[in-house]
Amino acid sequence: STPIKSSAASDVYKRQPYLLPRFFPQLMKKYPDLDIRVVEMKTNDIKKALQTGEIDAGIVASLAGMEELQQTPLFYEQFFAYVSREDALFNNEVIRTSDLNGEQLWLLDEGHCFRDQLVRFCQMKSARASQLAYHLGSMETFMRMVESGKGVTFIPELAVLQLGDAQKELVRSFAIPCPTRQVVLLTNKNFIRHTLLEVLVKEIKLSVPKEMLSLKATQAVV
């Protein structure tokens, strides 16, 4: 029998569509009695829901201001630029922050840690989401815009791993040190279901490439 059983569902709120398919099917196969609900939320909403006990755990990028919550490291994920063939940056082998400006970028709306980290890394004091980008609203949509010949967006390492050969031709690395985020499992410090957390951490770490489990010398956490 499974070592984890619960009469109530465990809510794991996460914001990474590229991570869930990697570990969730295997988790359910190994622990069929485990009841987990997964919902997408913005980082600040995750923090509030954890503090109120509305949810059990969240998978987020580690950020300042989370000291009152328990952070369990999962892996490190590098950012890449996704550049349209018609953009001047397409001919660059690597992208430097000085090459970027807010007008050519497709960015998520404010409140997404993915956007906030990259704006900080690129030192864009006045970067803002395009109104069109805001209404379209997802990383996948921005990627389709780039593929159709418009602008630049940013994608995480797990997304790059799923791209086809033609799409990978649009991927560019950043100059060293490459911007990278630490992904953590966030819980309330009073959460007592330690076995559940151990299982989640184990399965998530098994689902990503081993080289993502530690920070490389060429990477810098943003």
Give a label for each model feature.
Residues T2-A8:
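Single conserved hydrophobic/aromatic residue that forms the stacking wall/gate
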Residues A9-Y31, D35-E40, N44-K48, Q117, ...:
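N-terminal winged-helix
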Residues R22-Q26, R37-V39, T43-V83, E147-K150, ...:
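Short beta-strand-centered segments that line the small-molecule binding cleft or hinge
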Residues D35-M41, A61-S62, R128-S138:
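Short beta-strand-to-loop elements that line the ligand-binding cleft
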Residues K42, R96, G137-S138, P156:
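Short loop/turn segments at beta->alpha junctions
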Residues M66-P73, E77-Q78, N92-E93, E140-N190:
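Beta-alpha-beta core module
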Residues L69-L105:
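Flexible hinge/capping segments at coil-to-helix
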Residues Q104-K125, R193-V201, V208-T218:
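Secondary-structure junction motif
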